[in-house]
Amino acid sequence: MGRQVPSESLSLSEGCEVEISYKNNGNESVWYKAILEAKPNSIFKEELSVRLLKDDFSTPLNELRHKVLIRPIPPTNVQACIDIEIGTFVDADYKDAWWAGFVVKVIDDDKFWVCFDSPPDIIQFDRNHLRPTLEWVDEKIYSWWIIGSTRNSEFLKRLAEEPMFSPGTIVELCSKRDEGEVVWVPALVYKEFKENDEYRYIVKDKPLIGRSYKSRPSKTVDLRSLRPIPPPIRVKEYRLDEYIEVYHDGIGWRQGRVVKSEGGVMGSLFQNWCTLLLEATKKQLMFKQSDLRPLRVWEDGVWKTRESSLTQGSGDKTEVETQRKTFPKKTLPRNQNGSGNDSTLENENSNRKRKREENLCSGSSVEETNILFEKKLPVWKILESMEVFKTIPQSPHFRPLAEIREDSREMLAVGMMLTFSCLLEQVKALQHDEARSSFISLSNSFAELEKHGFNAQVAQLRINKLLTLRGMQSRKMDELKGAKKVTAEKESVKVENERKILELQRLNEEMAKEIAQSMSCEGKILQQLDNMKLEFQATASAPWPKWAFRST
C-alpha cells in the first residue's frame, strides 16, 4: 500500500478541471486533462460536457459516464513524493495526458527513459514531467490519493538475469534487402516477451539519416534477428581484400571488400579513402575510411572476425567462405508465419551467457596482444596473481597501442593493468559525500580502458548505481532541509503561541481580580437592595398612627 494524501472532493460543476480515463481507448492507464462545460443547446441545466484541454474534443458527460473514469486534479506537489530508479512505475506527462509506464534507464539525476506497454514505446522525460502512479479513492464523505512507490518486479527479475536485449537497449537489427543482401540497421528494443518458450522482441529500426525512431513502425523479431552494437575498433588503415562493413545511404551496415585504399584532401583536412566492392551488388564505390568498420560476425554470443583471403591459407579461406555463406542464413529473421527450425535455439540461448564469459579469457586477444608486443617484464606474473584479476578476469587487446612506438607498448600496457586495478579500489572507496565529478572521472577512466579491451561493465554499472543513490541522497538532503525549515517555522509559531498563552493567562488573572471586585460590589448592592426591600415591606405594612385620624 502506498502513501495516502487527503484529496478534495470531486466537483462536477461547470468550469471544474478534472482528469478522465477512457475505458475503450485501448489503454485504461492514460489520464487526460479535461474541463467540464455546459452542453450547448441543452434544455437541462445540469447536463455538462467534457472538453479535452488540448484537442477541443467535446462529448456529453451523460453519454460518457459509463465509459469514462473521472477524478479531480491531483495535488501539484506529488512529484516530490517519488524516488526514481530503474524499474519504478511512473506516470509521464505526454501529449497532454498522463501515461503509465516504468523507468528502464536513468540518464542522469533529471533525465529518464520510460517504457510504455501499450503501444510499446520508450521516451525520454525530464523529472518534472514525471509523477508517481496515483489511485483516487472516493468514499463520498471522505476521499484520498494513494501514491504508489512500487517497481516492476517482473522487469527487475529479468534484468537480474543479465539479458542481452532488455527494453531500452540499442542494438542492430537484421534486415533482408533485394538479392538476399543482409543489412544490419541500428535499432532500439522496446519490449521483450515470451512466446512458445522463446523470447521475442518488439523493436524499431533507425530510418534514413536525420529522422527519428518514432517515424518507423515497430517490428516483432526473434533473438537471431538481433545483435549488440559492435565495440569500436580504431583502424589506422584498411588492407586490400579486407572484409568491412559500410554505413551506406542511411540504409544500414552493408558488407563489402576493400579493393583500393588511398589518401585525399577534403577542404583543409586529409582523409583516407577506400574503394569498396559491395558484395550484394558487385558495384565499386568510394567511401571515407571513417564510414567503415571491420566486418565481424556475432555467433554464439561472441564476436568473430572474418579475415581476408590474403592473410590465411587455403584451408582457412574455405572455413571463412563457409562462415560467410552461413552468416546471412544464421542471422536472417524468420518468416513469422513459418514454423522455422528451432531445435537448437533453446540450447544456444541457455549457453550464450556462459560462452560470452568464456570468451573473455579466450586466447584470441592474447594472440593479438603478442603481435603488438612480447611480454618480457616479470611484473606480468605478479599481475596475473593479483586477486582483482582472478575475481574480474581481463583479456585486453591493446589495439590502440599499435600507433605507439613498439618499445613503449609493453610498459603502457602494464600501466593500464595497474590503473584498472587502482580504479576498482577507488570505486570501492567512494564515499556518499564525494563530489559528482569524482564519479564521472572514474567512469571516464574506465571508458578509456574499455577502448583497449578491458571489461569494465561491472565497475560502470556500480558507478551508475552509486550515482543514482547519490542523486537520491542529494534530493533527500534537500527534502531534509525543507523539512527542517518547516519544523523551525512550526517551532517559532509554537513559541509565539506559548507567549500568547502566557499573555492571555496574565490577562485572565487580572480579569479574575476585576471580576472578584465586581462580584464584591455586586454583593454589597444586593445587600443594599435586600435592606431596601425589607424597609419597603416594613414601611408598607406598618399600622397607621392613631394621631393621623384625630379630628381637629
UniProtKB/Swiss-Prot annotation:
Which cysteines pair up through disulfides? They are none
Signal peptide residues on this chain, from the entry's feature table: none
* Residue ranges, annotated region (Disordered): 308-361
Summed up, the tissue specificity of this protein is: Expressed at low levels in leaves, stems, flowers and siliques.
What happens in the null mutant? Answer: No visible phenotype under normal growth conditions.
Keywords in UniProt for this one?
A: Growth regulation, Transport
Domain DUF724: where? 371-543
Q: Where is the composition biased (Polar residues)?
A: 333-348
Spell out the PANTHER family in the cross-references: AGENET DOMAIN-CONTAINING PROTEIN-RELATED, DUF724 DOMAIN-CONTAINING PROTEIN 1-RELATED
Function, in words: May be involved in the polar growth of plant cells via transportation of RNAs.
The name this protein goes by in its record: DUF724 domain-containing protein 10
Provenance organism: Arabidopsis thaliana (Mouse-ear cress)
Gene name, please? DUF10
